[in-house]
Amino acid sequence: MEPYYNKISKALLKKFKEIVGEQFSFNDYEVRWTYAFGGSIFNKNWVPDLILIPKDAQQISKVLNLANKNRIPVTPRGSGTSLSSGSLSPYGGIILDLSQMNRILKIDIENNLVEVEPGVICDELNEILKPYGYFFPPDPGSSSVATIGGMVANNAGGIQAFKYGVTKNYVMYLEVVLPDGSLLNLGSNVLKSVSSYNIMDLFIGSEGTLGVITKVGLRIRPLPRARKLGLFIFKDVDDLQEAVLDLRRSGIIPNLLEFMDKLILKAVTEYLGGEFFDFPMGYVLLAEVDGKSLREIDEEFTNMFNIIIQKNPIFHKVAMNEIERERLILARKANLPALSRIRPNTCVEDCTIQISKFSEVIKKIEEIPKRINAKNLLVAIICHMEGNLHPTFLFNENDEQDVRDFQKAIDYLYREIIIPAGGSITGEHGIGKIKTSYLELEHESNVIELMTQIKKFFDPNMILNPGIGKGDSRELNTPNIKRSLKNQSNGIMELKCMRCGFCISCPSRMNYQLETYSPRGRLCLLNGLVHGDLELNDLIIEVFHTCTLCGLCQTKCPAGVNTIEIFEKAREIIHKNCEKS
């Protein structure tokens, strides 16, 4: 029998509010609207029915127990940066905003261990660990806002995965609340223990479908004291691949090995200017080694450099100090804002391949627009060189043909390139709400059935993050990507917000502890007002006037959205509307 869900009655609403407290429970439509958006460009007006902000595992246990008994869907959410719509709620129900469970509970240097709540931010954890000389190595592109709970749920990696691995390599133990409200303690605080089945690993990468993570024990490592970076440009991607394969054969393990294609280099050059104008166009390989001392890394870097140079790059530059290193790394970090200047919309995909098939796959991805006869669609490619590709599609969401071409391109990518190459449809972003239809291409039917059985064992009523493809094969409506403000007649400037969430470290958001009061939340409200989904009211007026116009969000925004100008203009329009009424 297909799972079914109930609406939240007034009586249930009262009970949920009693659990977390009135001030941490929100059912205003305007607040719920802002939680219908996340880091993905996709949405389908999946507006939740209730937002709850719990403070501990006991509150979460009571919420889940009540929700399970009454068949109310529950979706855990950290910072809402998922690029696969993982924290959106297609069936309504409750969003559990875990961002305020953000305490570091223990730092145990002697045992190389930290214990944290799920809402702790990755970069903030590393800032606190730095004086101890330790760090937590996984570093996703969203590390400035990514929560540890979200990183565990998606098994996040990052640009140092080539050497340091991904999140699962560092999780020692978890505290998890199951859908029925029961609490599990999994794993161990010692490095070796085989006294049970490895149940903990089921929850790492489960995307919040089996339980809600409420505590994480993480292994930490000594912070490297020295590092050295080189940038190499190749005319031919085959030569670049051979350089990487030779590095692997040598036993040298760079802490950073990153690829950028020609389109990204061109975009970054125009975006950053300066010395980048002296770089020839080609395929970029960024390679870095780190270690305990300059002497140690100088020898290893020289060996790495000599291996790469043998494959005849057309250009190379070695960072001689930290300032030069940061400048070269900026070429990698600036890819999204640079690409967003070419087309209004960017969609970053996520897939993995064997590195021995790298150049073959890159060439096929570059051919996608031609293969599907797309006139305006562009594709750029970035890659963590352990084999984790991020093809990025550039298009205009207000052009219906562009949208159709984009959707065809995604389909072609997975069906005609990644799966035939023996790859995986996701390496670190997750299946989310948008890749379920591709699961059967990668996994045999008995494996998918086993995933379904595991899901139903832990969550028989299917209340926890429904819509995620793992264990839930129900098809969702095709997500809608028309969600931003472009060329509006009411005078609001063009907006290129990617919903990435990098702006959520905002003073008013920190004060109100609610997504709605973040710059992204305000832009979502503006979106609703412009498209007629929302009507101006006192709450929306208050949200816009709590913005201090400090400009912090502008410094954080990869797309360069001029939030100050937009919010000032929005206030003017609000004032005019208030005067008329």
Predicted regions and their residues:
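N-terminal flexible segment immediately upstream of the FAD-binding catalytic core
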Residues: 1-65, 81-112, 141, 264-274, ...
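C-terminal substrate-recognition/cap domain of FAD-linked oxidoreductases
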Residues: 26-37, 222, 231-234, 239-409, ...
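Conserved phosphate/anionic-ligand binding catalytic regions in large, soluble enzymes, centered on
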Residues: 82, 87, 151-152, 197-214, ...
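FAD-binding subdomain of flavoenzyme oxidoreductases
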Residues: 103-258, 464, 480-481, 488
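Activity-critical C-terminal alpha-helical subdomain
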Residues: 182, 436-486
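Short acidic/histidine-rich active-site segments
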Residues: 381-384, 424-431, 466-469, 508-511
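Ferredoxin-type iron-sulfur electron-transfer modules in oxidoreductases and energy-metabolism complexes
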Residues: 404, 476-494, 509-581
